[in-house]
UniProtKB/Swiss-Prot annotation:
Induction (UniProt): Up-regulated by the Ca(2+)-regulated transcription factor NFATC4.
Residues with the N6-acetyllysine modification: K126, K275, K279, K285, K299, K300, K307
Signal peptide region: 1-21
GO BP field: amyloid fibril formation; amyloid precursor protein catabolic process; amyloid-beta formation; amyloid-beta metabolic process; cellular response to amyloid-beta; cellular response to copper ion; cellular response to manganese ion; detection of mechanical stimulus involved in sensory perception of pain
Glycosylation (residues): N153, N172, N223, N354
Source organism (scientific name): Homo sapiens (Human)
Residue location of crosslink Glycyl lysine isopeptide (Lys-Gly) (interchain with G-Cter in ubiquitin): K501
Protein name: Beta-secretase 1
Gene name linked to the record: BACE1
Localization in the cell: Cell membrane; Golgi apparatus, trans-Golgi network; Endoplasmic reticulum; Endosome
Length: 501
């Protein structure tokens, strides 16, 4: 029996190891729906958790509660830059890839990075310009020593963009002086040769290639003190802290390593399917972005979702400006009718073939409290779902319900119910699965790619068409010039004859 025990344990371990496949993008025509069994069909799970891996799980006490911020203004972490170290608050942004800090006086900055005071700063003698839908910044690239006091006990030399000019980038009263882009090099500015901070961290240290975020949105404050108006959270660098979530972690593949792109396969409002072509949900991409406040949806999806939310909450009438994010709605303090607003479920592609899982979002997430206009008698909210022209963006209001694991090493993103999410006694945020879903890869939007040979063929065809149009014109011009020359010769001869007479 003792000799058979190791083989028995080995066999049992093999049964729970996850299987991984490679995702391939396939260009196919739009589908009218997803095939397969109904999404309501739940499949049994063999295990709730994957085997633990050394260094990936455990306690990260020094990193817990290392994020601060204000509702709608982003979450920031304290970082030090240079020698001697200069302390700055840096916005945590999974939707960009540059590490950039204010490096010149600005009305909204209480402090800024002073390169001339750092003995370890190296100028790369290269400029960088980053425009946004609204706002922009430009600066100069360099490198310096960087560390995170409430993070891993390491110091790395990282690329830094020193922001010298900006417009509508810094936010008055936000208390952050820079931005930490945690996405991939492909979207770094000025180009993908600029190594992002997290890549430098992993290469120069023994920190595992993953991080996780717990964003704890503000429940509506009882008064307007600075402390109660703040939000907090945790950024766990290099691992997963099991104390920050409840239940199981469910993973969805990262479709492409630029933004943190995922695939949404279905959307429900209060359990009712929007019944749209699943490609519409991902047109032209779906990303997880902590630097964006709202849940942003493509135009068609936004209109369908708002129509369904309006119908579900029809017991009260709201101005059109509320649904566009232009007007607030207020109720007497403590009387917000959460029950009239529906829950929203997003189904994400699972790691296992033909399986998906769903994350359920509460109205306490997509109705964002606006503290600076509320009084002690009123609770006021802004509708935090908005229209997008650049695809679906799962912003902070979505992430605030969940513990989100950015497992870069295994190219996947995990979701579990956050231990700090806001809820009521009737409903709670949820992560549930698995559900049967077929042909999920077809839901991803593929940007049309045109290779050089195709472009050359098009160029030759266009040149031939131009030549066909130009040839008759050239013949007509030549004929006209010949006739003109003959007429001039005739006229000259006639004049000579008249003179002789």
């Amino acid at each position: 029996m003792a000799q058979a025990l190791p083989w028995l344990l080995l066999w049992m371990g093999a049964g729970v190891l996850p299987a991984h496949g490679t995702q391939h993008g396939i260009r196919l025509p739009l589908r009218s729906g997803l095939g397969g069994a109904p999404l309501g069909l739940r499949l049994p799970r063999e295990t709730d958790e994957e085997p633990e891996e050394p260094g990936r799980r455990g306690s990260f006490v020094e990193m817990v509660d290392n994020l601060r911020g204000k509702s709608g203004q982003g979450y920031y972490v304290e970082m030090t830059v240079g020698s001697p170290p200069q302390t700055l608050n840096i916005l945590v942004d999974t939707g960009s890839s540059n590490f950039a800090v204010g490096a010149a006086p600005h009305p909204f900055l209480h402090r800024y990075y002073q390169r001339q005071l750092s003995s370890t700063y190296r100028d790369l003698r290269k400029g960088v310009y980053v425009p946004y839908t609204q706002g922009k910044w430009e600066g100069e690239l360099g490198t310096d020593l960087v560390s995170i006091p409430h993070g891993p006990n390491v110091t790395v030399r990282a690329n830094i963009a020193a922001i010298t000019e900006s417009d509508k980038f810094f936010i008055n009263g936000s208390n952050w002086e820079g931005i930490l882009g945690l996405a991939y090099a492909e979207i770094a500015r000025p180009d993908d040769s600029l190594e992002p901070f997290f890549d430098s961290l992993v290469k120069q240290t023994h920190v595992p290639n993953l991080f996780s975020l717990q964003l704890c949105g503000a429940g509506f404050p009882l008064n307007q003190s600075e402390v109660l108006a703040s939000v907090g959270g945790s950024m766990i660098i290099g691992g997963i802290d099991h104390s920050l979530y409840t239940g199981s972690l469910w993973y969805t593949p990262i479709r492409r390593e630029w933004y943190y792109e995922v695939i949404i396969v279905r959307v429900e409002i209060n359990g009712q399917d929007l019944k749209m072509d699943c490609k519409e949900y991902n047109y032209d991409k779906s990303i997880v972005d902590s630097g964006t406040t709202n849940l942003r949806l493509p135009k068609k999806v936004f209109e369908a979702a708002v129509k369904s939310i309006k119908a579900a909450s029809s017991t009260e009438k709201f101005p059109d400006g509320f649904w566009l994010g232009e007007q607030l709605v207020c109720w007497q303090a403590g009387t917000t009718p959460w029950n009239i607003f529906p829950v929203i479920s997003l189904y994400l592609m699972g790691e296992v073939t033909n399986q998906s899982f769903r994350i359920t979002i509460l109205p306490q997430q997509y109705l964002r409290p606006v503290e600076d206009v509320a009084t002690s008698q009123d609770d006021c909210y802004k509708f935090a779902i908005s229209q997008s022209s650049t695809g679906t963006v799962m912003g902070a209001v979505i992430m605030e319900g969940f513990y989100v694991v950015f497992d870069r090493a295994r190219k996947r993103i995990g979701f579990a119910v956050s231990a700090c999410h806001v809820h009521d006694e009737f409903r709670t945020a949820a992560v549930e699965g698995p559900f049967v879903t077929l042909d999920m890869e077809d839901c991803g939007y593929n940007i049309p790619q045109t290779d050089e040979s195709t472009l050359m063929t098009i160029a030759y065809v266009m040149a031939a068409i131009c030549a066909l149009f130009m040839l008759p014109l050239c013949l007509m011009v030549c004929q006209w010039r010949c006739l003109r020359c003959l007429r001039q010769q005739h006229d000259d001869f006639a004049d000579d004859i008249s003179l002789l007479k």
